[in-house]
Amino acid sequence: MIYRPDYVEAVKPFIDQPLVKILAGVRRSGKSTIFEMIREELKQRGVGDDRILMKKYTEMDVPENITAKQMYDELTSAMIGEGRYYLLLDEIQEVPGWEKAVNSLLEGGRADIYVTGSNSKLMSSEISTYLTGRYILIPVYTLSFREYLDFKTDSKLSRNELLDEYIRFGGFPIVALGNYEAQSAYQIVDGIYHTVVSRDIVKRHRINRQDLFDRVVKFVVENMGKTFSANSISTFLKSEHRTISVESIYNYLRWLEQAFIIYPCERYDLQGKSILKTQEKYYLSDVSLKYALLGYNRKMLDGVLENIVYLELKRRGYEVFIGKNNTKEIDFVANRRDERVYVQVCVQLPDNSDREVGNLMEIKDHYPKYVVTLNEMDTGIENGIRIVHLADFLLSEQL
């Protein structure tokens, strides 16, 4: 088991607090392993094995049509005697109404509760009803580059060679743990994707025309890091003689978000200081999904690098937007409490770097500004703007 300390550290302040700790992220991102780490942390604090109840709620682990009442009864019957129990409940979204059972357990005062899930419906209005102010959400992502290096301590490859591998193979832990050729790695990722689609989207939402759903997904993946709308997808599909309503496309995008396959990135108007509700971008929960679905192509690199930087900013707790500064675009405006950073991303700086450096120079404030590049020869400082190699950006202690 490779330790992922960031998540354990995120949980530590809330141990023994009357809050449900929710760890949510795409399937196979390592949530169950993080549970094992939390279990070890509890044991180091003196909690006995008999006081830690771990339960999986995947399709293979529980009876079909299990109810919240059955779940509650099963857990309370296992809490024998007085004292506190620690409940680690994995993939809990498979139990309809789980939040009612968890709320009752929490109100009983004897349970410290941790849950994982692979669907953002974990954060539905039902939770607002039953757990208002009584939960903390900890997003779980696939491996950062720093974590990827931890998984590869036995590798003889250089840091930059491992970065190239990370760019091509992504950060699903199961892939990083192996030593796979590209075809095998993408087969694994393709299997993860199709499991998510079949279980969390097609089956759950009763999609009849999977061919249309698959075509919408392909459009989104092909246009990763580009602005588009449901209307523009509909128009494009009409050009292929495929008919689908804009409402259906909105639903498909929402369900992909809920399953953590994609993340939306809204535009932020730096002049008006407001979020724009049109022409957002989408990024994938792991860059390997793009290659698994479309095949590897070095020409995709610009969008892939953007995706990697976007996820790194999200991991660090930033709220990430596309920046609009009059007619100029900034790849990312990232806010975290009273902090802000601006980031442009490119494979290498062109001879005329007006878009990368010039666009940032037009922003007249004191916040840090970066150009992140894959070309080490481009790095340095230009007019106060830090031009940094991708690996250095991903491994930096702070921005």
Where do the language-model regions lie?
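Catalytic cores of nucleic-acid endonucleases
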Residues: 323-324, 347-391
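Accessory nucleic acid-recognition modules appended to NTPase machines
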Residues: 180-339
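Short regulatory helix/loop adjacent to the ATP-binding pocket of P-loop NTPases
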Residues: 121-137, 152-153
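Conserved lysine of the Walker
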Residues: 31
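Short glycine-rich substrate-engagement loop in P-loop NTPases that contacts/grips substrate
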Residues: 53-83
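Hydrophobic positions on the alpha1 helix immediately C-terminal to the Walker A/P-loop
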Residues: 34, 38
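Pre-Walker A adenine-sensing motif
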Residues: 2-16
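Hydrophobic anchor at the beta1->P-loop junction of P-loop NTPases
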Residues: 23
